[in-house]
Every structure is written in C-alpha cells, then in structure tokens.
C-alpha cells in the first residue's frame, strides 16, 4: 500500500466543523478586492472516499479499477491508490502516472483495444500484463510486442440506451469472438478474460444483464478453445451524482444477481469494473467569474400588457468555457446548471439569460438559456458535479489557462484513508466511518445555494 503523510498531499486539511463549501467561500473572499478573479475548483477528496465505501457495500464482489482518463489529477489518483483500487489506463502516459505513485503493475489494466506498438512495448517493459483487444490485428501486434501479455477480449454490447455510446468503435461480436479466441490460441497468446462497456449514462440496467450473459457465452467459447479464463471486466457507466434518472444502487441491484447467476462466487472468476465519473463527478465544484455582460433588447411586439423586463435578455461571459472545463458539453453530452454564489432577494426579478465562455469562438456557449436575476461583472457562478471529463480534456485555447484546483479533506476522511491502507481493515469499520465524513460541495440543507432556473438539466453523468 502507499503510505504517505499529510506533507505529501497538496491538500487543505479542514479544521473540525469546516467543509469544502467554507473553503470555496474563503477563496472567493480572498480575491473579492482583486482584479484577478480567476476560475477555480474546490475538490473534496473525502467525497471520493465516501464513494469508495459506497462501492464496497453495493458491489462487494467487484474490484474497481479507476478510469484515469476521466480525471487524471495527481491528488485523485493518489487518493484512490491509497484505498487499494486498481487503475484502468488507456496510454503510456497514464501508466507512467499511476506507477509513479507506487501502484504495482498487477493493479493496472491497459484497457485500450487499439494500442500503438511502442506503447505495448512500454507496458511489457514495465510489467503491465493485462490489456484488452477486439481484433486480429491487435492480436498480431501483441504477439510480437508483448507475448507474455494476459489478454482480455472486449466484446460489443447493446449501448442504444446510453448517452455516450462506445460499441460503435470498440468490441467484438459474439461470432467474431470465437474466431479471435481460435486465432489467439494459434498465436500462443493467453486470453484470461472478457470485458465490455455498456456506455456512459446508461438508462437501462438490463443492458448489464445481457452483457454479462454474453460474457458467459464467450467464457464458454474460451473453454472450448482451450483457455482457462478467470477475469470478467464489467466496464464503466456508473453515475457519479444523484441528479440522474437511474441511481447507482438501482444499477448494482440488477448487476449483482446477474453476476451470481452467470459467474457465481465459487466459479473462480475475478470480477473488476472501470468506474470513472462515479468516483470524481460530485467531488468537484467549479467557481467562475463574470468578466463581461451584454444587454440584448428584444424586438418590440406592440403588446401593452408585456412587462418591460421581458423586453431584454442578458448575455454573461465567464472565465472558463467549452475549450476549458466545459468541454464536457461537447464531448460528454453534459448539461450544466449554474448556482448563484450570492443569494438573490425574494422579490428579485429574473431575466432570460445565456452564459458564454471567454474565447473568441462563437460556439463557446455554456448555457443557451436560463432564468437569472440581473448579475454584474465580478459576480460568481458555481457549477457542481464538475469532476468528470472536465479538467482532463481542458485546453489552453486562446491562451486561457486551466483553473487551479484546491483540494480539501477532513480529519475523519484522512483517518479513513489511513485505515484503508491497513491490510486488516475490517468491513464493519467501512460503514461506521461513512457517516462521519462531511458533506462535500453538495451543500447541507441549511446552507443551500440558490439554484438558477435553467432550461437545461443538471450535468448528465
């Protein structure tokens, strides 16, 4: 396990009674009299530990391998490494990051079915053996570059009910799977298991059942060909926040019986998964500052009974956009909703508004329409559930820098992380400590932020 002390974490350790919300307000207050009101994140590492406890309870047979691509922030990876999770890496760079933090190669799966030969060789030279494939060409590459690899066959699934579909790009059909297994046997390459991914934002948990059933078929094919497969990877697609139609426990409530049916506990099959957004989405809150404002007058309709306020809309420009943190709107099908840092007056008027990023691109729009009280340059907007597929894909287009991330952790969360590193960590401690962890940036009832009335839903995770 990775033993490290507070000094190794670039993290603010919260005093008793303080939460991530307090740090966010503190950072805003610190720059209130300055012109440098840059966008920033507050990330609650304790929220990630709470998610891990929740995972252990909901999917006790499934070992999580965190999808590094979702958020490769070093503090996130290090926190999860301390809990003993594995890691789903998609490239040489991600493998380097994870191994630089002391994670052994046995806790890494190179889960990219289409790999560059030089990166396959890098994995071989650094002890990473588990890797996925879905084609004969990939088999040939691995046979030459990493003959001792432990291969996992990625199969296609019905991801028609997912927001982000992956089977259009990855996965072998059942018919092709048999041919690939036979070819792997000819090449003397060891196939140790099967993987699949039902897609992100899956709205039908029965998709998992069908995929697990298909995986069982491929296991049986493997046995007929002569492989003794022992690994099932059920992929990702687990929600990372509560503002979704299908809750995490609703999904796991369907997965567990399917696993027991097709891969019972006495089958000798190890089961892993590749959660990404599940762990990090709700841990991050983004604060952006209004840097410009434009009033747009609507064309007069001639109606006498129209409220004068309805004749204008507001355009707000903030210092992060779709080329930065909000790339999730373009690439992850996210719908974001702002929170107001200042509580509006009860009788304050609301206006039709739109929110735009800082770049020169006319497509840099964050929210097409929402109802907000009139705001001003220098005011702050907050966006919750911004930990997944945001900072990892942010660019510096137009010279706009990525927001700073301020990590926080409570005392109980820190103690829990130390307990995770104890090999004798008892299951009963897990539930006991879950309730002691503080609420993160999903504000407690007495401190709730005022939520703007937007046409779009909260971020889709």
Curated annotation (Swiss-Prot):
Positions carrying Phosphoserine are 303
Expression triggers: Down-regulated in response to enterovirus 71 (EV71) infection (at protein level).
Q: Which GO terms describe its cellular component?
A: cytoplasm; cytosol
Task: Please name one Pfam family that this protein belongs to.
Answer: Orn_Arg_deC_N
Q: What is its EC number?
A: 4.1.1.17
Give residues where N6-(pyridoxal phosphate)lysine occurs.
69
Does the record bear Transmembrane in its keywords?
Answer: no
- Return the broad EC class: lyase
Q: Pathway it belongs to?
A: Amine and polyamine biosynthesis; putrescine biosynthesis via L-ornithine pathway; putrescine from L-ornithine: step 1/1
Q: Which cofactor does it need?
A: pyridoxal 5'-phosphate
Q: How is its activity regulated?
A: Inhibited by S-nitrosylation. Inhibited by antizymes (AZs) OAZ1, OAZ2 and OAZ3 in response to polyamine levels. AZs inhibit the assembly of the functional homodimer by binding to ODC monomers. Additionally, OAZ1 targets ODC monomers for ubiquitin-independent proteolytic destruction by the 26S proteasome. Inhibited by 1-amino-oxy-3-aminopropane (APA, an isosteric analog of putrescine). Irreversibly inhibited by alpha-difluoromethylornithine (DFMO).
Q: Which residues carry this modification: S-nitrosocysteine?
A: 360
Tree of life domain: Eukaryota
Protein's GO biological process: cell population proliferation; kidney development; polyamine metabolic process; positive regulation of cell population proliferation; putrescine biosynthetic process from arginine, via ornithine; regulation of protein catabolic process; response to virus
Which GO-annotated molecular functions does the record name? ornithine decarboxylase activity; protein homodimerization activity
Please list the residues that bind substrate: 331-332, 361
Provide the reaction this enzyme catalyses: L-ornithine + H(+) = putrescine + CO2
Per the UniProt record, the site (Stacks against the aromatic ring of pyridoxal phosphate and stabilizes reaction intermediates) maps to 197
Q: Supply the alphabetized keyword list.
A: Decarboxylase, Disease variant, Hypotrichosis, Lyase, Phosphoprotein, Polyamine biosynthesis, Pyridoxal phosphate, S-nitrosylation
Sequence positions that bind pyridoxal 5'-phosphate? 200, 237, 274-277, 389
PTM note says: S-Nitrosylation inhibits the enzyme. S-Nitrosylated in vitro on 4 cysteine residues.
Which residue positions are annotated as catalytic?
360
Q: Which disease is it linked to?
A: Bachmann-Bupp syndrome: An autosomal dominant disorder characterized by global developmental delay, alopecia, absolute or relative macrocephaly, and facial dysmorphism. Neuroimaging shows white matter abnormalities, prominent Virchow-Robin spaces, periventricular cysts, and abnormalities of the corpus callosum.
Q: State its role.
A: Catalyzes the first and rate-limiting step of polyamine biosynthesis that converts ornithine into putrescine, which is the precursor for the polyamines, spermidine and spermine. Polyamines are essential for cell proliferation and are implicated in cellular processes, ranging from DNA replication to apoptosis.
* Subunit organization: Homodimer. Only the dimer is catalytically active, as the active sites are constructed of residues from both monomers. Does not form a heterodimer with AZIN2.
Q: What is this protein called?
A: Ornithine decarboxylase
